[in-house]
């Protein structure tokens, strides 16, 4: 049970059977994490460096907890205080880190493709923790695990992804993963927040929220990424919530057992009604956070197996 590639850079590189392999292992780690003794030894003796060029308390903490629960020596690199702020290039940084012989490198970067570039320059396993608008593979995997545990399957479901699609690497990774697993995907939101390459995605597009949610099994809301907008994308937050914010009235168009998701952090009263976000009968938002640790444990475990096998092969 392993992955074919040395790195986890995107969902686009994973085959359906690899997705299932990773989710099956993550399922076991999710159960382990609910026990009093949560620790495993899959990463014993390995060094994990978390290097985040964008702030992300949630994702960084999730990767740190995942690594420590499996026995890794975890270091969080403070990019703001590093040589990068003094003019060092990404390649210089990669080569410097490589000389220290880390085993796992977790990277988040504001530019699409930066993590792939870094992966070409190091000998360790690299995990993409989000790069620009490109991909966020572990978020899509944790969303998939959350869906599978809630619905009992991960195929032939109707999934609505709603909101700021254009600026969302989460949306792109989820579209790729859910498509590989034979689900029907709808994108719901204003035209100004739809990606230019929408015709290539193989999805249905709705500008009307109620029509887009009609009969769906899963409602996945996205954060309005105001920091990536120059203005003009939406008239106002109040108008956006009126048309595209998820509330009980709009959710009533989905199936009665439809689940509500959000990758966080949430803008309550903008993307989603706060009461609905906290509704334990419909919302699985806290389960997403929980599954994030399990998925990252599974991903690092599988990559570590490849790393150790490769090193054993060299020694042989």
Swiss-Prot record:
* Listed Gene3D superfamilies: Aspartate/ornithine carbamoyltransferase
GO BP, sorted A to Z: 'de novo' pyrimidine nucleobase biosynthetic process; 'de novo' UMP biosynthetic process; amino acid metabolic process
The first-level EC class reads transferase
| Cysteine-cysteine disulfides | none
Please describe the quaternary structure of this protein: Heterododecamer (2C3:3R2) of six catalytic PyrB chains organized as two trimers (C3), and six regulatory PyrI chains organized as three dimers (R2).
| Similarity comment | Belongs to the aspartate/ornithine carbamoyltransferase superfamily. ATCase family.
This chain belongs to which protein, by name?
Answer: Aspartate carbamoyltransferase catalytic subunit
Native organism is Dinoroseobacter shibae (strain DSM 16493 / NCIMB 14021 / DFL 12)
* Taxonomic lineage from the root: Bacteria, Pseudomonadati, Pseudomonadota, Alphaproteobacteria, Rhodobacterales
Q: Which gene encodes it?
A: pyrB
